[in-house]
Design a protein with these regions (language model features):
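Hydrophobic alpha-helical membrane-insertion segments, chiefly the h-region
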Residues: 13-26
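Long, charge-dense tracts
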Residues: 81, 91-131, 162
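Primarily the internal scaffold of c-type cytochrome electron-transfer domains
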Residues: 25-99, 143-166, 172, 177-291, ...
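N-terminal Sec-pathway targeting helices
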Residues: 1-16
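Long, hydrophobic/aromatic-enriched structural stretches that serve as scaffold segments
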Residues: 127-136, 173-176
Length: 344
């Protein structure tokens, strides 16, 4: 081997080792972040501001939920004042006699959970169970003290002590002492247990779904005490849940409302996101809510989980292209077609 060949071989060997190291660093990076666990004062744990300095990347990305830009496809999104009743006027007739015929707006980001709830025209006459998922105050204070008693309180009384900073925040999904994901919505825990699933003994990957699923699901309020329950017993597809209601398994609950014109008992699917996911190809592949809606990001060499809970088409590189080999344009076109076929 000539001297030049030896030099070239040496350069190639160094490059192989260097790039191999880079690839290993990227691929083998742990799923959790390397952020050190911070001690949050107990009297500040239900708020958000106390976590700001300890977890700046997560906090700053969470505040991006204030974004009200439209969806990349033009359907849905978080724009203030966008009404389903305007976009789909047939809903006014479909929901006649029900409060959703009065106001039914597009969801805004989680940072608006408190203000949008307090300002909805559907609020009068509701009970405390309506804010079970809006703040961890409901669990960490009310439920720990007196179980489901809060569920039957007038809504004004139940939400009165909740400070502005204590609506949906870090402790809604994380144990404030350990920052581990926590599944604590008792109605969800009980409903999954009836299916033989102990959600708090689940794998970390499953918890990345359950932490969202405990609130993003179909639910109803038990007639006896107002507690939250879920129609999961017979299965998670729409037909199984409908059969649950029809068979009298719902503990005295029979309908969401009586239609004003037809007088027929009616059911309204709330937001069965968990069930839609659980019966999907993504769930079969082990892909969770977090993988698509809160993907891993990197900033200044730090890997972290984005807490901007948003449309995956706004983070296509991180959310979709880690698995899909199609282009971003192809994936968007596919979603666009589904939206067009649904709403046009």
């Amino acid at each position: 081997m000539s001297k030049l060949q030896k030099i070239l071989a040496g350069i190639i060997a160094v490059c192989v080792v260097f790039f191999g190291f880079v690839v290993v660093r990227i691929v083998a990076a742990p799923n959790d972040t390397s952020v050190k666990l911070a001690k949050i004062p107990q009297d500040k744990q239900l708020g958000k501001e106390a976590y700001k300095d300890a977890y700046p990347l997560e906090y700053n990305s969470f505040m991006k939920n204030n974004d009200t830009s439209p969806s990349p496809t033009g359907y849905g999104g978080a724009q203030e004042g966008n009404s389903h009743l305007t976009e789909q006027p047939e809903m006014v007739e479909n929901f006649k006699g029900y409060k959703f015929a009065i106001q039914y707006d597009d969801d805004r980001g989680h940072t608006y959970a408190g203000v949008d709830f307090k300002n909805t025209k559907r609020l009068p006459g509701q009970k405390g169970n309506c804010i079970t998922c809006k703040s961890s105050y409901m669990y960490d204070v009310y439920y720990k003290q007196s179980g489901w008693d809060y569920a039957s309180k007038p809504i004004e009384e139940a939400m009165g002590p909740i400070e502005d900073d204590q609506w949906f925040g870090c402790s809604t999904c994380h144990d404030p002492e350990t920052m581990e994901l926590r599944v604590y919505q008792q109605g969800f825990i009980d409903s999954m247990a009836r299916r033989g699933i102990d959600v708090n003994n689940a794998s970390h990957n499953d918890k990345r779904a359950y932490v969202c699923a405990q609130c993003h699901n179909e639910y109803y309020f038990m007639k006896e005490d107002g507690r939250v329950n879920h129609p999961f017993d017979n299965g998670l597809d729409a037909e199984s849940e409908y059969q649950f209601y029809q068979s009298g398994q719902a503990g005295g609950f029979t309908q969401d409302w009586i239609h004003a014109d037809s007088k027929a008992p009616m059911l309204k699917a709330q937001h069965p996101d968990f069930e839609t996911w659980a019966t999907s190809v993504h769930a079969d592949a082990g892909v969770t809510c977090v993988d698509c809606h809160m993907p891993y990001m990197r900033e200044n060499g730090q890997k972290y989980t984005s807490h901007w809970m948003t449309n995956p088409l706004k983070t296509t590189e991180e959310s979709c292209l880690k698995c899909h080999d199609e282009s971003a344009e192809t994936l968007k076109a596919r979603v666009q077609t589904i939206g067009d076929n649904t709403f046009k």
